[in-house]
């Protein structure tokens, strides 16, 4: 195996394929990248057995086919440490891979390519193409609600659901729920899968905001995404995700509307004096007015009074202020609509001008 490539053509692919690699690999070869040269292309692959990222680099200079695996971190650090515009010549000699550039020379240990694990072949059941911006919006709108190391393992991920000509993402940790739907050009069969948390983060990392469309394939145990020269595959979480439709409040009869930024700033200020552990704030809603209060064990108090649009009956309700702020940060809109029922029912929060995303937050007894 032999190839020569410019540093700039290698850096981004190396960074992307190193993404799935954890801190301390369980098997030594999982800390390595698979390098394969064939048909004028260099393929780089990184995996942690749960997911895999493949990058392709076109080789314009003379090369010889072959394959090997090298320590990912060291190879990336060497390439990154070389000066801009450097040409990198790589050659496999016995069980060593030689890397040369200018007057620098490195000899890396290798492990056989045949030992590198690859995800089993699988059949795709649903396929569709969408703009990168659409996928980015779907993930950004819901990502923060995923659970973190919950024993209900199926919550440590994101539900991707196709229905008609819509793609939907849902995430919940049992205290709050986020759902976002975006239209697709094609009509698709109804299908839903749970992508693990780490897979969602990697999928987000591969979106470069460019014009290249994203092609998605979903099988019974895997999801694959192609964009440009990158192919990402992740195993799915086996489990039953809660039905978000049953979590949305049934018929909230009280609607409050207010400016998103004004609300965000008021909640952020009140949060300073909320209990550091429980993060509780109280909301008092009356005609066209919202009062937010917070206090802590040191008997310190915060009070914010805002003019809002509200015509329902007076009520008070408590929330974890962090959950509300997460929603307001994700909404990025001008006016927010908050739909309330009573002090013990969850509320629904959405952009007043668009129904594409909805957020549900459970109340807190204060």
From Swiss-Prot:
S-S bridge residues: none
GO biological process, one term: DNA strand elongation involved in DNA replication
Highest taxon above the source species: Bacteria
Signal peptide annotation: none
GO cellular component terms attached to this protein's record: cytoplasm; DNA polymerase III complex
SUPFAM superfamilies for the chain: DNA clamp
Molecular function GO labels: 3'-5' exonuclease activity; DNA binding; DNA-directed DNA polymerase activity
UniProt keyword annotations, A-Z: Cytoplasm, DNA replication, DNA-binding, DNA-directed DNA polymerase, Nucleotidyltransferase, Transferase
Cytoplasm listed as a keyword: yes
Subcellular location as annotated: Cytoplasm
InterPro entries: DNA_clamp_sf, DNA_polIII_beta, DNA_polIII_beta_C, DNA_polIII_beta_cen, DNA_polIII_beta_N
Role noted for this protein: Confers DNA tethering and processivity to DNA polymerases and other proteins. Acts as a clamp, forming a ring around DNA (a reaction catalyzed by the clamp-loading complex) which diffuses in an ATP-independent manner freely and bidirectionally along dsDNA. Initially characterized for its ability to contact the catalytic subunit of DNA polymerase III (Pol III), a complex, multichain enzyme responsible for most of the replicative synthesis in bacteria; Pol III exhibits 3'-5' exonuclease proofreading activity.
Subunit structure: Forms a ring-shaped head-to-tail homodimer around DNA which binds and tethers DNA polymerases and other proteins to the DNA. The DNA replisome complex has a single clamp-loading complex (3 tau and 1 each of delta, delta', psi and chi subunits) which binds 3 Pol III cores (1 core on the leading strand and 2 on the lagging strand) each with a beta sliding clamp dimer. Additional proteins in the replisome are other copies of gamma, psi and chi, Ssb, DNA helicase and RNA primase.
Name used for this protein in its record: Beta sliding clamp
Natural source organism: Salmonella typhimurium (strain LT2 / SGSC1412 / ATCC 700720)
């Amino acid at each position: 195996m032999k190839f020569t490539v410019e540093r700039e053509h290698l850096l981004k692919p190396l960074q992307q394929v190193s993404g799935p690699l954890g801190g301390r690999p369980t098997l030594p070869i999982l800390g390595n990248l698979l390098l394969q040269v064939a048909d004028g292309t260099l393929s780089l692959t990184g995996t942690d057995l749960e997911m895999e990222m493949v990058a392709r680099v076109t080789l314009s200079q003379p090369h010889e086919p072959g394959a090997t695996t090298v320590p990912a971190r060291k190879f990336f650090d060497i390439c990154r440490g070389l000066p801009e515009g450097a040409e990198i010549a790589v050659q496999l000699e016995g069980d060593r891979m030689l890397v040369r550039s200018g007057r620098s020379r490195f000899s890396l240990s290798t492990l056989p390519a045949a030992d590198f694990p690859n995800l089993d072949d699988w059949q795709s059941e649903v396929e569709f193409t969408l703009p990168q911006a659409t996928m980015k919006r779907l993930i950004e709108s819901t990502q923060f609600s995923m659970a973190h190391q919950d024993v209900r393992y199926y919550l440590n991920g994101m539900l991707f659901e196709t229905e008609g000509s819509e793609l939907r993402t849902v995430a919940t940790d049992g205290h709050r729920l986020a759902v976002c739907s975006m239209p697709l050009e094609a009509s698709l069969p109804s299908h839903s899968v749970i992508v693990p948390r780490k897979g969602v983060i990697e999928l987000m990392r591969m979106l470069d905001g460019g014009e290249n469309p994203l092609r998605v394939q979903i099988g019974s145990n895997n999801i694959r995404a192609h964009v440009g020269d990158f192919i990402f595959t992740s195993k799915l979480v086996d489990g039953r995700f809660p039905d978000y439709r049953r979590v949305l409040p049934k018929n909230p009869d009280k609607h409050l509307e207010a400016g998103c930024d004004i609300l965000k700033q008021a909640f952020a200020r009140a949060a300073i004096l909320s209990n550091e552990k429980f993060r509780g704030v109280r909301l008092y809603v009356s005609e066209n007015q919202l009062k937010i209060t917070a206090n802590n064990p040191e008997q310190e108090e915060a009070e914010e009074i805002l003019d809002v649009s509200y015509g329902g009956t007076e009520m008070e309700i408590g929330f974890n202020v962090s959950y509300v702020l997460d929603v307001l940060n994700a909404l990025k809109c001008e006016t927010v609509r908050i739909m309330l029922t009573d002090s013990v029912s969850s509320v629904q929060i959405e952009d007043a001008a668009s129904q594409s995303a909805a957020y549900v937050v459970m109340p807190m007894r204060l």
